[in-house]
UniProtKB/Swiss-Prot annotation:
Name this polypeptide is given: UPF0145 protein Daci_3728
Similarity comment: family membership: Belongs to the UPF0145 family.
InterPro entries referenced in this protein's UniProt entry, alphabetically: UPF0145_dom_sf, UPF0145_YbjQ-like
Native source organism of the sequence: Delftia acidovorans (strain DSM 14801 / SPH-1)
Organism superkingdom: Bacteria
Length: 106
């Protein structure tokens, strides 16, 4: 499965548009508590613990996106957009969402 942020794939023709697909992942409040406890990981203004959690959430969202595209018979997702949003009372959760257009490539 090809997943790309571009609207098309060079050298490949889109033969069918299957529809919009999306995947989401939410990091809960406990993750933030753990992250703040791990602030000692900070090197050069970056937290390795926080970055690992964001990467894991992004991978989950993209995996869900891929699974939904496969269910529609697609072999690629184009125009993928990743969004990050703070949710919940006291901003205790972070949502990572991925959306794009499932397509069939020639």
């Amino acid at each position: 499965m090809i997943i790309t942020t571009t609207p098309q794939i060079e050298g490949r023709r889109i033969t069918r548009y299957c529809g919009v697909v999306a995947g989401e992942a939410i990091l809960g409040a406990n993750v933030f508590k753990d992250l703040f406890a791990g602030l000692r990981d900070i090197v050069g203004g970056r937290s390795a613990t926080y970055e690992r959690e964001l990467q894991r959430a992004r991978e989950i969202a993209l995996k869900e996106l891929e699974e939904r595209a496969q269910e529609l018979g697609a072999n690629a997702v184009v125009g993928v957009d990743l969004d990050y949003e703070v949710l919940g009372q006291g901003n205790g959760m972070l949502m990572v969402s991925a959306s794009g257009t499932a397509v069939v490539l020639e």
